[in-house]
Amino acid sequence: MEKVFNFCAGPAMLPVDVLAQAQKELVNWNGLGTSVMEISHRSKEFIKVAEESEQDLRDLLAIPDNYKVLFCQGGARAQFAAVPLNLLGGNTKADYVDAGYWAQSAVEEAQKYCTPNVINTIIDVDGKKAVQPASEWALSDDAVYVHFCPNETIDGIEINDLPVTDKPIVADMSSTILSRKIDVSKYGVIYAGAQKNIGPAGLTIVIVRDDLLDLASQTLPSVLNYGVLADKESMFNTPPTYAWYLAGLVFKWLKSNGGIDAMETHNRKKAAVLYDYIDQSDFYRNDVHSDNRSLMNVPFQLANPELDTKFLELADEAGLKALKGHRVVGGMRASIYNAMPLEGVEALVQFMKEFEEKYV
């Protein structure tokens, strides 16, 4: 079978080793004669999966003891509502840092429950999109928390600064979690949809500081209530057990491959290979300033957009899948999350060279 590299922004590719283990264990997990997706979430066997998964994630991210780790459902979009409903505590104002589509989506949901102070941080630097330094963000004095999305997958923009504030910082890390080292203690809440760097769609990770667990609105549905979910150890209702199991396999894969430090080195190398080729070419371009280029999502355009369809068609035939850019911006996008090997990026660059030589 021809080797295929999946550049989809999400659901994204999973590590081959993880898929192979899941395949091997699919119909007879741990000698039980059943699949792990068929056993009770309250069985001792699955409780072990849950506990090991949480501990492995804590180890990888060095999560302090005064934080709860929740394995939730509903995707990051559910958290757009859950965050204000859990954190406002009767107040009405929160700061929202806007660097792109996903931050704006969070604002649209949050304004049903509070008055967001929206801080537009995108600026132009030498004709490229960049992010205003955090020290210049116009944060409000009376905001309950500051929300931001460190990586905008559609525009390929990464925020490298943290908000300068003494308020709880809330981060949508759906596309960056586990890709590079972070200091969890600097955040009040971190949430992430699983389908990029954690596992398959259907699972959402929430990491929340203990002192923020008792502020929820009285009308908040229990399935979104951080305090309820923490008290019930993420089993208030039946969790997505198979997605949880696969996430656990990914965590073990990460640990066995050197942890977050090794993964960050790997990711920076991959991104550099692709950006370096784009920058030296007049045939391709990337519109993001080098200070804010995403490690995970690399959008690029052709000098002649009429060739987009041909590029995507031939790339697909070459085993380079899902390179079409988001409908909002068009062009191409290569999502190179943790599971993407350097070999895949090198194959893409080689294809780009050959395509350029043929159609320049």
Swiss-Prot record:
Keywords: Amino-acid biosynthesis, Aminotransferase, Cytoplasm, Pyridoxal phosphate, Pyridoxine biosynthesis, Serine biosynthesis, Transferase. GO terms for molecular function: O-phospho-L-serine:2-oxoglutarate aminotransferase activity; pyridoxal phosphate binding. Disulfide bonds: none annotated. Pathway: Amino-acid biosynthesis; L-serine biosynthesis; L-serine from 3-phospho-D-glycerate: step 2/3; Cofactor biosynthesis; pyridoxine 5'-phosphate biosynthesis; pyridoxine 5'-phosphate from D-erythrose 4-phosphate: step 3/5. Binds 1 pyridoxal phosphate per subunit. GO terms for biological process: L-serine biosynthetic process; pyridoxine biosynthetic process. It is found in: Cytoplasm. Gene3D superfamilies: Aspartate Aminotransferase, domain 1, Type I PLP-dependent aspartate aminotransferase-like (Major domain). The keyword Zinc does not apply. Transmembrane segments: none annotated. CDD domains: PSAT_like. SUPFAM superfamilies: PLP-dependent transferases (SSF53383). InterPro entries: Aminotrans_V_dom (IPR000192), Aminotrans_V_PyrdxlP_BS (IPR020578), Pser_aminoTfrase (IPR022278), PyrdxlP-dep_Trfase (IPR015424), PyrdxlP-dep_Trfase_major (IPR015421), PyrdxlP-dep_Trfase_small (IPR015422). It catalyses: O-phospho-L-serine + 2-oxoglutarate = 3-phosphooxypyruvate + L-glutamate; 4-(phosphooxy)-L-threonine + 2-oxoglutarate = (R)-3-hydroxy-2-oxo-4-phosphooxybutanoate + L-glutamate. Its cofactor is pyridoxal 5'-phosphate. Its EC number is 2.6.1.52. Pyridoxal 5'-phosphate binds at residues 76-77, 102, 153, 172, 195, 237-238. Homodimer. Catalyzes the reversible conversion of 3-phosphohydroxypyruvate to phosphoserine and of 3-hydroxy-2-oxo-4-phosphonooxybutanoate to phosphohydroxythreonine. This is Phosphoserine aminotransferase. It comes from Aliivibrio fischeri (strain ATCC 700601 / ES114) (Vibrio fischeri). The gene is serC.
